[in-house]
C-alpha cells in the first residue's frame, strides 16, 4: 500500500487545503500521515508531527536543520519510510525528503510567486515591494533550492482554469483546488457572504452595514450583533450559501477565491497583508477581473452586488489525487 506524508505550510490556506485533501483521501488505498503547524491544523484532524517544535522560539523566521528536534523528525520519517512526500512548500519536510531520496512533490498556491512567467505587470512589485522583500533573499533562495530538488512543482490555484490562464515557467504545472459546486436553494440565499478563519474584524465591521449577511468562520459562537455567524466546518451549507449569495468577501486565501470562482461569484478581498500568499492571490485575481481589493470598511459594496464571473474548467488540469493514482 502506497505510503504518503503530507506536509502543510505555516499559513491559514494550508489548513483549508489539508482538510480538503484528507477528505478526498478517505477510503482510498493509501496510508497518509500528516505534518502540520498549529496554524495549519484543521479542527478534528489527527496530526502525526506538529512542526512548531522545529521552530526557533525566539526567531521563528530562522529555519535551521541543525537541531535535535529536526534530527528526531528525520529519524521518525525515515522509520515511516514514505513512498511519496507532498509538501505545501514546507521547508523541514522537504529537507527530510531530499536527505532520504524520497519522491517529493510540491503542491502549493505560494508557487505563484515562482512559477508565473509574466508577473511584473500586475502591480505586485510596484505596490508591494516591501512585502515581497521583507523576508530577505535568503528565504527566497531557500525556497528556490527546495523547488529545484522536487520531482514535481504543482501550482495549487484556480487561475489555471480561467479562460486565459497565466503562462507558467518550465517545470511547473497547475493543480486544481478542491471545491464543491453549491446547489441552487432559496433558504441559502443571502446578500453578502464572507469566509474567514479568524473572524477578521474589518470584515465583520463591513458586513454589519449590509442586511441579510452571513459569515462562515471557525468561531461561529462568538456573538456579533446584526450578523449571522455559521460554522465553516459545515461545508455543505457553506457551498450552498456561496452559490446563492450576491457577493463573496474573504482575505485572499487561495481556497476561498477558488470556491467563489468555480461557483461563478465575484469576490472582494480585504487582504491579509501579513500573509504573502493572500497578497499575491488578491493581486492576480484582481488583475484578471475575478475580484477587487477593498481597503477600508467605509467603502461601499453596492456596485459589486450581483456581479458574476464565468467559471470554467481546463480539461488538461487535474486534482492532486489524480496524479497520485498514476503512481
Task: Label each residue range with its predicted role.
Residues 1-81:
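Glycosyltransferase specificity loop/lid
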Residues 129-152, 287-327:
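Leloir-type glycosyltransferase catalytic cores
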Residues 37-43, 47-49, 53-56, 197, ...:
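Catalytic donor nucleotide-activated moiety binding site of glycosyltransferases and closely related
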Residues 5-18, 125-126, 131, 157-161, ...:
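Active-site donor-nucleotide binding/catalytic segment of nucleotide-sugar enzymes
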Residues 85-89, 114, 238-281:
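A donor-sugar binding/catalytic signature common to diverse glycosyltransferases
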Residues 68-128:
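Conserved nucleotide-sugar donor-interacting segment of glycosyltransferase catalytic cores
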Residues 65-75, 219-262:
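Donor nucleotide-activated moiety binding/catalytic core segment of transferases
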Residues 103-173:
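Active-site-proximal region of nucleotide-activated glycan assembly enzymes
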Amino acid at each position: 500500500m502506497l505510503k504518503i506524508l503530507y506536509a502543510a505550510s505555516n499559513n491559514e490556506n494550508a489548513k483549508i487545503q489539508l482538510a480538503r485533501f484528507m477528505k478526498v483521501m478517505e477510503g482510498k488505498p493509501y496510508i497518509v500521515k500528516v505534518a502540520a503547524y498549529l496554524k495549519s491544523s484543521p479542527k478534528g484532524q489527527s496530526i502525526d508531527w506538529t512542526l512548531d517544535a522545529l521552530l526557533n522560539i525566539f526567531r521563528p523566521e530562522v529555519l535551521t536543520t541543525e537541531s535535535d528536534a529536526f534530527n528526531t523528525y528525520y529519524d521518525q520519517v525515515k522509520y515511516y519510510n514514505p513512498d511519496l512526500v507532498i509538501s505545501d512548500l514546507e521547508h523541514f519536510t522537504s529537507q527530510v525528503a531530499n536527505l532520504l531520496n524520497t519522491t517529493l512533490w510540491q503542491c502549493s498556491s505560494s508557487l505563484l510567486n515562482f512559477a508565473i512567467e509574466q508577473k511584473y505587470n500586475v502591480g505586485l512589485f510596484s505596490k508591494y515591494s516591501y512585502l515581497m522583500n521583507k523576508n530577505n533573499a535568503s528565504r527566497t533562495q531557500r525556497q528556490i533550492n527546495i523547488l529545484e530538488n522536487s520531482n514535481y512543482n504543482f501550482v495549487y490555484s484556480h487561475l489555471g482554469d480561467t479562460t486565459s490562464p497565466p503562462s507558467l515557467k518550465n517545470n511547473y504545472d497547475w493543480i486544481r483546488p478542491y471545491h464543491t459546486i453549491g446547489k441552487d436553494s432559496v433558504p441559502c440565499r443571502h446578500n453578502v457572504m464572507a469566509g474567514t478563519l479568524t473572524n477578521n474584524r474589518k470584515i465583520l465591521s463591513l458586513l454589519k452595514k449590509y442586511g441579510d449577511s452571513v459569515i462562515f468562520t471557525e468561531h461561529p459562537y462568538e456573538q456579533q450583533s446584526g450578523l449571522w455567524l455559521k460554522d465553516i466546518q459545515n461545508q455543505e451549507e457553506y457551498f450552498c450559501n456561496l452559490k446563492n449569495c450576491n457577493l463573496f468577501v474573504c482575505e485572499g486565501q487561495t481556497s476561498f477565491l477558488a470556491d467563489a470562482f468555480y461557483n461563478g461569484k465575484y469576490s472582494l478581498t480585504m487582504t491579509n497583508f501579513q500573509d504573502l500568499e493572500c497578497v499575491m492571490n488578491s493581486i492576480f485575481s484582481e488583475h484578471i477581473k475575478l475580484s477587487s481589493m477593498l481597503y477600508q470598511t467605509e467603502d461601499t459594496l453596492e456596485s459589486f452586488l450581483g456581479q458574476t464571473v464565468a467559471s470554467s474548467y481546463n480539461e488538461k488540469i487535474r486534482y492532486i489525487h489524480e496524479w497520485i493514482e498514476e503512481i
